[in-house]
């Protein structure tokens, strides 16, 4: 928001963006809100990317082209990874329990 002083003697200024000519007053503060608006737009873009990350069919915000389904694939591999380790833990516990119940399994 740029302001040009048309006549400094009688305190008249013109807003370049709108072409409005008005009296300059000391009790009014003029603030440029364009940086704030840019920051709000950037935060809105991040919020939209976060919202899109909840749908596994969408690609991440700064991903290369053709990366649709990344979240779906990651979710599938995560389930397989944790499922494998949980199954292994249960298998070890069952094996230890079976050996303690029947010591003849290990030759004692």
Curated annotation (Swiss-Prot):
Database matches in Pfam families: MtrB
GO cellular component: plasma membrane
Location relative to the cell: Cell membrane
This protein's UniProt keywords: Cell membrane, Membrane, Methanogenesis, Methyltransferase, One-carbon metabolism, Transferase, Translocase, Transmembrane, Transmembrane helix
Membrane topology: Single-pass membrane protein
Keyword Transmembrane helix among UniProt keywords: yes
Pathway assigned to this chain's UniProt record: One-carbon metabolism; methanogenesis from CO(2); methyl-coenzyme M from 5,10-methylene-5,6,7,8-tetrahydromethanopterin: step 2/2
EC number(s) recorded for this UniProt protein: 7.2.1.4
GO molecular function: tetrahydromethanopterin S-methyltransferase activity
Keyword Membrane: yes
Catalytic reactions of this protein: 5-methyl-5,6,7,8-tetrahydromethanopterin + coenzyme M + 2 Na(+)(in) = 5,6,7,8-tetrahydromethanopterin + methyl-coenzyme M + 2 Na(+)(out)
EC primary class: translocase
Transmembrane segments: 79-99
InterPro entries: MtrB_MeTrfase
Main location: membrane
A GO BP entry: methylation
Family: Belongs to the MtrB family.
Complexes and interactors: The complex is composed of 8 subunits; MtrA, MtrB, MtrC, MtrD, MtrE, MtrF, MtrG and MtrH.
Protein name (Swiss-Prot/TrEMBL): Tetrahydromethanopterin S-methyltransferase subunit B
Annotated source species: Methanococcus maripaludis (strain C5 / ATCC BAA-1333)
């Amino acid at each position: 928001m740029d302001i040009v002083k048309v006549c400094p003697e009688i305190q008249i200024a013109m807003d370049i963006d709108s072409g409005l000519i008005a009296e300059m007053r000391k009790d009014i503060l003029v603030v440029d809100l364009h940086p704030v608006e840019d920051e709000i737009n950037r935060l809105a873009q991040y919020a939209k990317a976060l919202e899109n990350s909840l749908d596994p069919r969408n690609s991440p915000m700064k991903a290369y082209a053709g990366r649709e389904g990344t979240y779906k694939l990651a979710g599938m591999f995560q389930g397989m990874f944790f499922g494998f380790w949980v199954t292994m833990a249960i298998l070890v516990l069952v094996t230890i329990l079976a050996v303690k119940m029947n010591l003849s399994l290990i030759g004692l």
